[in-house]
Amino acid sequence: MAAESSYGFVYGVSGPVVTAEKMAGSAMYELVRVGHQELVGEIIRLEGDYATIQVYEETSGVTIGDPVLRTGKPLSVELGPGIMGSIFDGIQRPLKDIADITQSIYIPKGVSTNALSREARWDFVVSKDLRVGGHVTGGDIIGTVDENLLIKHKILLPPSACGTITFVAPSGQYTVEDTLLELEFAGRKQKFSMLQIWPVRSPRPVTEKLAANNPLLCGQRVLDALFPCVQGGTTAIPGAFGCGKTVISQSLSKYSNSDAIIYVGCGERGNEMSEVLRDFPELTMEVEGVTTSIMKRTALVANTSNMPVAAREASIYTGITLAEYFRDMGLNVAMMADSTSRWAEALREISGRLGEMPADSGYPAYLAARLASFYERAGRVKCLGSPEREGSVTIVGAVSPPGGDFADPVTSATLGIVQVFWGLDKKLAQRKHFPSINWLISYSEYMRALEEFYEKNYPEFVSLRTKCKEILQEEEDLSEIVQLVGKASLAESDKVTLEVAKIIKDDFLQQNGYTKYDRFCPFYKTVGMLKNMIGFYDLARHAVEATAQSDNKITWNVIKDSMGDLIYQLSAMKFKDPVADGEAKIRKDYEDLAEAMANAFRNLED
């Protein structure tokens, strides 16, 4: 039995917020166990010897006078092999293991299981340069575990550790708790295993933050071409219901060029999480000639809308801590938070129960600060320890403003923090134009950072993108005139702009995520398609403007009649399947089309 002083008593209960007395000596954000069922809670306010606790489980049945056990440690997560491919709830309880233990589809109250299996044995390969008498510091890699084909799990020393090695375990099979290394520092000996415990609210330390300069390619043409994000960037996807936020964040986790994915379903529908669980194991990728499931590089933190509200806040922190752990191994991690609005609503509810002063729309005044402290944990960094390595965490946060109103406090606070804004448009979604990203309001502030990458790999791309945006903007301006006076009264060059903009919108920006050929578009295909479309525009404009004064004028109708086949081929560029056809064939086909267009226009002008 624990000492008497480590117990307090329940004084009042209001939904997920419990007040306890006789809690003198406890700390902010300390983990406590409430009631006879030992529900998990966290102290969020201290006054005298009263503590206010937010409980991460259903509080029905807790009565006045129930014991509150103090644990003396903050809310923490377990880090080690076995994270990938598993499903946790908001406070890192493994849902699969709980289902196996209880044989029930419900999570019982007060259940406590280890996040990582203590029985599973992992093949540990010790680092070559570790030997007794050597010195190590925090963040050093002490060995590797091949967790699966996709993730080579590097075992790191905790950031605070350092000292002289007194014992090294040989390579072999170990559980996560077996001692692998013993250090001595200032006369104290410490043992280290594969398992690390880390408090979720404090960011993991790094050597330095670096400028991000490598694009996060997500296989959606409109995003990769017009509004690119970088590895280590922050992105917001705001949009009303049914605009396709979840589809975009799922396709990001399926096809992006990240090494590991943490997908946090925070207060969204349970069906969306089960969709992820159903789709991901079926999706495969090729690694060294072996086909393996994409689930092997994904960890899910599932916290659906019918789970307790307080755990939503924890789930975001749990997710970002897992992401930082994989970043410290030198991986590029992408974290999807779907959706941060539900998290803000949880903050609002707790804040209301505490009787704090409400600010805009009833959200607490510290909403923007909380959002910033979460988003600022993204970035590309130089990791602690040796050997030197770089890692990154990219955060993609979906925001669902009520009624699709972007002036909502959560959306406006988020836009002040993130660098990339992919605004979804209800009108586009109603026209069945997916991904429904509004190319007039979205923006990316990483254009300058990525210029070097484009110059090196796709030198013509930057000018193509600028031209593409100009065409879309011109089309928007012309559309008002067309609505007033009709198409016929426009100048010929404006007709060309309208028609090419239509091709760009329907065949470049639009993308069917449920087809083999279009669910993922590699960057070379994106650039090739854009090059031909802009090439056609330049040739057509030139032909129209060069012959405007002569007798045999070339009008848009002449071009359309004589080049129907080429225009069809422009639209059909998207049907090339990157997996079946391969890069070389697609590139050659696009070059042949460009040549055919140039010849056709030459013949037309002659």
Swiss-Prot record:
Q: Which residues carry this modification: N-acetylalanine?
A: A2
Annotated transmembrane regions = none
Molecular function via GO: ATP binding; ATP hydrolysis activity; proton-transporting ATPase activity, rotational mechanism
**Which GO CC terms are listed, alphabetically?**
proton-transporting V-type ATPase, V1 domain
Top-rank taxon of the source lineage equals: Eukaryota
Protein task: Catalytic subunit of the V1 complex of vacuolar(H+)-ATPase (V-ATPase), a multisubunit enzyme composed of a peripheral complex (V1) that hydrolyzes ATP and a membrane integral complex (V0) that translocates protons. V-ATPase is responsible for acidifying and maintaining the pH of intracellular compartments and in some cell types, is targeted to the plasma membrane, where it is responsible for acidifying the extracellular environment. Required along with other vacuolar ATPase components for the removal of protein aggregates which form in immature oocytes in the distal gonad.
> What is the name listed in the Swiss-Prot or TrEMBL entry for this protein?
V-type proton ATPase catalytic subunit A
Q: Species name for this entry?
A: Caenorhabditis elegans
